[in-house]
């Protein structure tokens, strides 16, 4: 079974039946799943940062969508930081778990953090998204590529083109798909610890299990049964578009071994070892298609946890500024941090 073969590098010496059972245990764990770790109830960003809380109308989704926003100055490009499977309705996980606003303050890049979208893959769903909390409309791709950039251009002087999408876990594949199909808006895409071949092997079944645990959603409501929509949203099958677009890519994945950054728990170690295989396959496909505009950051450590996703977002800052043509120092004044 292909699924079990993936784990031989992540978990050794484990009988076949126990390995299969461990898959379900890891995916249904309250710790991570394909989720992006656990979260606290308050934001990380310190008082004094010029972070705004916007309510952006979405006709496609029939409601206002909360956006956490930090301006990079007039006519600045944007960095869309996309959340994991367990995205909350109060704050974006990047603000809950990292000082990302601090890292990019005065960078010349506007930081855009959509709030909500649990289990959504930031996609336009075939059917209403029905879960434990009831039913809602998920048209996230339409919102991110049409409604939100138009709002930010009109109200916050953010360029509607030439921006970046970076996502962790669930949203890593989403960022690549956004760049594949919307190359003018997203010239840069970053994927951190994502499953990059979701339509392959048992991908749809495992994603369905994880979505059921993270909100009670059904994968069939998202992209239907196996078929064209799953393939359309599979980065490993859309490599040709990314190469043809000359999208700038940053692909990160650890190997399931913890370092001093933490994440030393079985689900975090197991999941990172699992998704690494799809990342290596994506790199092979990208190189085979003639790609030459990507950073592949495959560390000899790293588990499925926030400290390992914060590190590459800091590391790619200069590359983002150069690629997007940002003007460092632009943006609203910031109060100094207290000692």
Curated annotation (Swiss-Prot):
Binding residues annotated for substrate, in chain numbering: 85-86, 169, 197, 274-277, 281, 304-306
EC numbers for this chain: 2.3.1.122, 2.3.1.20
Enzyme category, top tier: transferase
Any Pfam family: Esterase
Primary site of residence: secreted
Source organism, top-level taxon: Bacteria
An annotated Gene Ontology molecular function: diacylglycerol O-acyltransferase activity
Subunit structure: Homodimer.
Family as reported in the entry's similarity comment: Belongs to the mycobacterial A85 antigen family.
Function: The antigen 85 proteins (FbpA, FbpB, FbpC) are responsible for the high affinity of mycobacteria for fibronectin, a large adhesive glycoprotein, which facilitates the attachment of M.tuberculosis to murine alveolar macrophages (AMs). They also help to maintain the integrity of the cell wall by catalyzing the transfer of mycolic acids to cell wall arabinogalactan, and through the synthesis of alpha,alpha-trehalose dimycolate (TDM, cord factor).
PANTHER family on file: DIACYLGLYCEROL ACYLTRANSFERASE_MYCOLYLTRANSFERASE AG85A, ENTEROCHELIN ESTERASE-RELATED
Protein name: Diacylglycerol acyltransferase/mycolyltransferase Ag85A
Organism: Mycobacterium gordonae
């Amino acid at each position: 079974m292909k699924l079990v073969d993936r784990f031989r590098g992540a978990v050794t010496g484990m009988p076949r039946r126990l390995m299969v059972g461990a898959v379900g245990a890891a995916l249904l764990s309250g710790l991570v799943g394909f989720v992006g770790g656990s979260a606290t109830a308050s934001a990380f960003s310190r008082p004094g940062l010029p972070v705004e809380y916007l309510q952006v109308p979405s006709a496609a989704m029939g409601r206002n969508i909360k956006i956490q926003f930090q301006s990079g100055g007039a006519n600045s490009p944007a960095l869309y930081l996309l959340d994991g499977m367990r995205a909350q309705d109060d704050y974006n996980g990047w603000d809950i778990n990292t000082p990302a606003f601090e890292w990019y303050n005065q960078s010349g890049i506007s930081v855009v953090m959509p709030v909500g979208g649990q289990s959504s893959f930031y996609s336009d769903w075939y059917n209403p998204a029905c879960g434990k909390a009831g039913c809602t409309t998920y048209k996230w791709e339409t919102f991110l590529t049409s409604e939100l950039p138009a709002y930010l251009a009109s109200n916050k002087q953010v360029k509607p083109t030439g921006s970046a999408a970076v996502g962790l876990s669930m949203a890593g594949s989403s960022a690549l798909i956004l760049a594949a199909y919307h190359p003018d808006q997203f010239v840069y895409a970053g994927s951190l610890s994502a499953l990059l071949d979701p339509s392959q092997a048992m991908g749809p079944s495992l994603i369905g299990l994880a979505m059921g645990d993270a909100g009670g959603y059904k994968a069939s409501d998202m992209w239907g049964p196996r078929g064209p929509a799953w393939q359309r949203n599979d980065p490993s099958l859309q490599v040709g578009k990314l190469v043809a677009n000359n999208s700038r890519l940053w692909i990160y994945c650890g190997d399931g071994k913890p370092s001093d950054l933490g994440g030393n728990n079985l689900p975090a170690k197991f999941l990172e070892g699992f998704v690494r295989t799809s990342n290596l396959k994506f790199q092979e496909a990208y190189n085979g298609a003639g790609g030459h505009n990507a950073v592949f950051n495959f560390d000899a450590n790293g588990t499925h946890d926030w400290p390992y996703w914060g590190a590459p977002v800091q590391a790619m800052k200069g590359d983002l500024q150069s690629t997007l043509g940002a003007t460092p120092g632009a943006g609203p004044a910031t109060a100094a941090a207290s000692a």
